[in-house]
């Protein structure tokens, strides 16, 4: 790095966090996930050239930002603060699906900015922001090299700390991304479990485990001999196998089965420890010792020739089929196997195949050497142009394989039926059926096949996550009708109870949050609720709730964010009870409410300025005005308008029940 290009100016500068960052647990400003808001003092004269810092971020730290860096050449530091924390979070499996947003203070503090950073974990988001500020400050140092090297040394520890609270695997990240794109609300329940949707239409997921996945079934399929037994007595094809306790027993059973054989852990999935196509007693002994390091339960299985396919089944429907090509390299007629593998591993650090599936690197290990020997090759051999050299016995993607999509119309119907039956007899709502068959275009009844594994929590390619959710939510978005009332009064005679009574009369089990009370139908289930946000979460978790009424009587939602992303009817009265003592004006409340896109807005008579602001936010088709809500015809009309919207939404296909 050339330090002279980094510090172009010795002019004073300021790049500091000011005040206390604010954690929104709910939804604000149109974001589809929690948000960290922080205030930044940014005053820079003649900003330095950041090309070296950019290169360091990408090449030395290996962090790629897919958000746009252009568009604000006058404030390059802000552009990076808008994008780089999100890149760090995504790298650590903290999903961020949209860039941060920046707004500038007007008036007394022209160099102060508010930045809204979307996140999953607020502490992780703040750590990423602080890290980026530290890195950007180095651009102003006369000799930044030493500082950058210190950053690089500490980066591994920083990454581990971020990853500790991140998601495991990649299923969950892309499920949440698909949910956001489909308009399905999500929030984190605990650790790796998320809720999608609300009330009676909500679903829980942990990766591709769902709230409908039976514990018995998932336990059975995790133990391969048990799953194979169930499949066998159901008339489905599986390979003959034996559990073995030592290498001598492994050799004896292999000889009884007849070579070649496969040795694998009986209680692990994902292709871990699998040794395939073993043809000698010596190779079986070595394989047993290797596999026993992964598990004390070792399985010897008859090798079944054929191509390896993963058939994805969700709720009795095949969503997609992949052929799993075993890991290897393709020759170019110039380079050795060793060089080809090194180059491929380097490319796979960030590469994904055309199915957007993360590709895994491969080590040049004993398995690779043995397979090369079987192909009459070694690490120095130069394969011909286009020649495929196999370096892995198992076809699993996790061990370096490559998935290739197979169009459903090319698959014989008998093979589709086979996969559906396998998932059905094992009682699995979501399943990955691994099928070995010579040609999937021909019936397994004619050419033979074997189900080698069933996975109750299968990894999927990105193209399947939206179909997965569409199937789970039956084409809907998991929402229930929501009425939000912004009004100080919260007696039992207020309008929220009137709306609830009418909804109940129509057979809609309606939840209500009003003051400190939470109701599900006619039952008060909580009298010490701290506010509408917490009350709404209670109702969202209750699968009996078919519609929700939130009576906002204080400014808790301004502090925590909205508990829902949508609103069917917004009723705006005199504002929350603490409005007079808060920093929030009626106009700010309207702007805050506009971010949840209410479909119908009913306003009590307001000052002209407030009403004019409402008309600028909500189009004339959405906005209605009622002179008064208490004791007159307008109150009744207001109540029935809200009730009719709720009843109409309840019948809408988008909000039909998920189960």
Report each predicted region and the residues it spans.
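Positively charged N-terminal leader segments that act as targeting/secretion signals
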Residues: 649-658
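Glycine-rich phosphate-binding P-loop
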Residues: 482-502
């Amino acid at each position: 790095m050339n330090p002279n290009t980094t510090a172009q100016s010795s002019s004073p500068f300021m790049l500091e966090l000011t005040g206390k960052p604010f954690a929104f647990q709910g939804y604000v400003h149109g974001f589809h996930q929690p948000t960290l808001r922080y205030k930044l003092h940014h005053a820079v004269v003649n900003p330095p050239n950041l090309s070296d810092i950019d290169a360091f971020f990408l090449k030395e730290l290996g962090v790629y930002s897919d958000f746009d860096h252009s568009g604000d050449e006058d404030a390059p530091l802000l552009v990076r603060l808008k994008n780089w924390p999100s890149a760090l979070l995504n790298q650590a499996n903290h999903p961020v699906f949209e860039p941060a947003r920046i707004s500038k203070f007007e008036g007394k503090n022209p160099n102060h900015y508010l930045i809204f950073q979307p996140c999953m974990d607020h502490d992780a988001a703040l750590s990423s922001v602080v890290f980026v500020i530290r890195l950007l400050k180095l651009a102003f140092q006369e000799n930044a090299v030493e500082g950058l090297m210190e950053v690089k040394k500490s980066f591994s520890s920083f990454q581990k700390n971020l990853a500790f609270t991140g998601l495991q695997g990649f299923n969950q990240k892309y499920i949440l991304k698909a949910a956001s794109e489909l308009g399905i609300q999500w929030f984190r329940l605990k650790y790796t479990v998320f809720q999608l949707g609300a009330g009676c239409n909500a679903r829980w997921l942990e990766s591709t485990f769902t709230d409908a996945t039976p514990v018995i079934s998932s336990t059975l399929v995790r133990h391969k001999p048990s799953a194979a037994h169930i499949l066998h007595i159901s008339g489905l094809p599986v390979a003959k196998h034996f559990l073995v306790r030592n290498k001598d027993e492994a050799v004896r059973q292999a000889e009884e089965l007849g070579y070649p054989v496969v040795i694998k852990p009986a209680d692990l999935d994902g292709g871990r420890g699998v040794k395939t196509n073993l043809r000698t007693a010596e190779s079986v002994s070595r394989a047993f010792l290797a596999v026993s390091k992964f598990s004390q339960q070792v399985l010897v299985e008859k090798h079944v020739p054929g191509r390896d396919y993963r058939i994805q089944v969700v709720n009795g429907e095949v969503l997609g089929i992949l052929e799993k090509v075993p890991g290897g390299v393709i020759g170019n007629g110039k380079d050795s196997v060793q060089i080809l593998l090194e180059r491929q591993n380097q490319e796979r650090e960030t590469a994904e195949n055309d199915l957007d599936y993360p590709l895994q690197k491969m080590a040049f290990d004993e398995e690779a050497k043995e397979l090369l020997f079987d192909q009459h090759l070694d690490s120095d051999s130069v394969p011909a142009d286009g020649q495929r050299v196999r370096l892995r016995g198992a076809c699993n993607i996790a061990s370096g394989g490559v998935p290739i999509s197979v169009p459903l119309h090319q698959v014989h119907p008998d093979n589709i039926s086979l996969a559906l039956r396998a998932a059905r007899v094992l009682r699995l709502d979501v399943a990955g059926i691994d099928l070995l068959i010579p040609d999937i275009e021909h019936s397994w009844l004619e050419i033979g096949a074997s189900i080698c594994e069933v996975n109750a929590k299968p990894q999927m390619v990105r193209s399947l996550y939206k179909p997965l959710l569409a199937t789970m939510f039956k084409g809907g978005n998991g929402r229930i009708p929501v009425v939000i009332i912004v009004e100080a009064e919260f007696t039992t005679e207020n309008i929220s109870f009137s709306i609830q009574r009418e909804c109940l009369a129509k057979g809609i089990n309606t939840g209500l949050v009003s003051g400190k009370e939470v109701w599900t139908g006619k039952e008060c289930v909580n009298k010490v609720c701290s506010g509408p946000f917490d009350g709404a979460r209670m109702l969202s978790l209750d699968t009996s709730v078919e519609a929700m009424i939130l009576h906002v009587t204080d400014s808790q939602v301004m502090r925590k964010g909205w508990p829902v992303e949508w609103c069917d009817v917004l009723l705006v009265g005199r504002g929350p009870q603490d409005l007079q003592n808060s920093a929030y004006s009626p106009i700010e409340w309207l702007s805050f409410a506009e971010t949840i896109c209410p479909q119908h807005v009913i306003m009590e008579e307001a000052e002209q300025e407030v009403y004019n602001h409402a008309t600028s936010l909500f189009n004339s088709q959405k906005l209605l005005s009622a002179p008064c809500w208490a004791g007159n015809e307008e109150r009744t009309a207001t109540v029935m308008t809200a009730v009719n919207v709720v009843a109409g939404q309840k019948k809408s296909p988008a909000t039909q029940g998920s189960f």
